[in-house]
């Protein structure tokens, strides 16, 4: 059963629409669905709400520590409410998946994502669930003939808003993720994965 859903992103209006904030977009939608508002909760270093979703009580969290210190926020809440790593779902942007794709997985490495890296370090565990929201990689924007030796600027890419057509398919992927939240929250994660991964 999932008791805590974390959205990763950077605080501040200048980052709201950037690719790196895709995790925030999902949690914002969940808060709207639950008819609740995320509020600044200093003891958890983030915006927090306790929500009733699909008949269950769920904690929603958006760390306000900047991405590379997200673990500080997650562990503060998890320890306070005695939530185990495998009861946590972290929604985050995923460079290695194209815009419009979304996948669930348990555990694994950070894939170079600093937010995941810090959460793993603070929880002393990789065994938490991830909802990977595809944002694409800047190398995909380089013509194939020019890719050899090219060094795309990943940091700049994730801190820019998606193009309009990318935003549309990212929004659609978040809608697909929201559609499986009843199973996710109830702990039927294998079923949720089958349903989500059936729709690329």
Curated annotation (Swiss-Prot):
Quote a single Gene Ontology cellular component term. Answer: cytoplasm
- EC nos: 3.1.1.29
Spell out the molecular function terms from Gene Ontology: peptidyl-tRNA hydrolase activity; tRNA binding
Alphabetical GO biological process terms: protein quality control for misfolded or incompletely synthesized proteins; rescue of stalled ribosome
> Any idea which residues are catalytic in this one?
20
Q: Which superkingdom heads the taxonomic lineage of this protein's source?
A: Bacteria
Enzyme's top EC category: hydrolase
Record's function text: Hydrolyzes ribosome-free peptidyl-tRNAs (with 1 or more amino acids incorporated), which drop off the ribosome during protein synthesis, or as a result of ribosome stalling. Catalyzes the release of premature peptidyl moieties from peptidyl-tRNA molecules trapped in stalled 50S ribosomal subunits, and thus maintains levels of free tRNAs and 50S ribosomes.
Q: What is the name listed in the Swiss-Prot or TrEMBL entry for this protein?
A: Peptidyl-tRNA hydrolase
